[in-house]
Curated annotation (Swiss-Prot):
GO CC term (a single one): extracellular region
Active site, per annotation: E159, E266
Protein name: Endo-1,4-beta-xylanase 2
Heme recorded as keyword: no
EC identifiers of the protein: 3.2.1.8
Source organism: Pyricularia oryzae (strain 70-15 / ATCC MYA-4617 / FGSC 8958)
Catalysed reactions listed for this entry: Endohydrolysis of (1->4)-beta-D-xylosidic linkages in xylans
Length: 331
């Protein structure tokens, strides 16, 4: 465990014991930190997604500092954002997020290294196996190497399964077959041996879904047996109202695949969602391998799907019933 991790582990206890300063409470408008409560239950964090622009908007920064213990960059670490033109890197937005997190003792989740979407055209146009292998290895080494030791976990591969559990068609699977998964994870382990390496996907929201059973769990078991260094599975958790209990059960099914960790990585729940947020929180608490939950944003109108009011804070940064349901689930 790094020294920063030790400090993170001690901070919530102090936060629970001491009264919250009035000025801080006004800035964040929540009575209790769900991150502090989560850590008091033995988990690592309750986090949120953000990026440079959001950190400079309204009360986002103050709320993240007070109520969340982990951050995931929503877009700034995706391949197209970092290297849309080959060899020309745009580091500034991602650097800003990392610097914010480090200076405020927040854990970081790197998102994401290998993904079929938001991918530069020059990568999509590669047809040679050896060339694509080298490009993957260099990308992973360069990106992870820039923040080595600062990022706790990485989504190494993202959204690689179809709904029936088969592998999604992409430049990676077309040119390399399933072997791109091994190539990416081995490169990631070499780039930062201490980082936790994840495979991440959506619609893993029912323990009986084919995408979970025939896709994620079956493949991860096979890859682990072959020595692929996968540490964890991330279930994104982009839910509709009423799906919270299904995801809670699915967390256990994912943990049973043999990975060391599971996490809910991009949680948002459309509709009347307080009961669902509570169910997901309790589901993570019930599974020892579940290390934490990340909400996919702070307030509703900054969400990628704002029409369903899916997050924990409303447009005025007031904590919603969903936030309070998480607080109650953690008591």
């Amino acid at each position: 465990m790094k020294a920063s991790s030790v400090l993170l582990g001690l901070a919530p206890l102090a936060a629970l014991a001491a009264p919250t300063p009035e000025a801080e409470l006004s800035a964040r408008q929540a009575q209790q930190s769900i991150d502090a409560l989560m850590k008091a239950k033995g988990k690592l964090y309750f986090g949120t997604a953000t990026d440079q622009g959001l950190l400079n908007t309204g009360k986002n920064s103050a709320i993240i500092k007070a109520d969340f213990g982990q951050v995931t960059p929503e877009n700034s670490m995706k391949w197209q954002s970092l290297e849309n033109t080959r060899g020309q890197y745009n580091w500034a937005p991602a650097d800003a997020l990392v610097n914010f997190a480090v200076s405020n003792n927040k854990s970081i989740r790197g998102h994401t290294l290998i993904w079929h979407s938001q991918l530069p055209g020059w990568v999509n146009n590669i047809n040679d196996r050896n060339q694509l292998t080298t490009v993957i290895q260099n990308h992973v080494a360069t990106v992870m190497g820039r923040w080595k030791g600062k990022i706790r976990a990485w989504d190494v591969v993202n959204e690689i399964f179809n709904e029936d559990g088969t592998m999604r068609q992409s430049v990676f699977s077309r040119v390399l077959g399933e072997d791109f998964v091994r190539i990416a994870f081995e490169a990631a382990r070499k780039a930062d041996p201490n980082a936790k390496l994840y495979i991440n996907d959506y619609n893993l929201d029912s323990p009986n879904a084919a995408k979970l059973t025939k896709g994620m769990v079956a493949h991860v078991k096979k890859w682990l047996a072959a020595g692929v260094p996968i540490d964890g599975i991330g279930s994104q958790g982009h839910l509709q109202s009423g799906q919270g209990n299904g995801l809670a059960q699915a967390i256990k099914a994912l943990a049973d695949s043999g990975v060391k960790e599971v996490a809910v990585t991009e949680l948002d729940i459309q509709g009347n969602n307080a009961n669902d947020y509570a169910a997901v929180t309790k589901g993570c608490l019930a599974v020892p391998a579940c290390v934490g939950i990340t909400a996919w944003g702070v307030r509703d109108n900054d969400s990628w799907r704002p029409q369903g009011n899916p997050l924990l804070f409303d447009s005025n940064y007031n904590p919603k019933a969903a936030y309070n349901s998480v607080v109650q689930a953690l008591k």
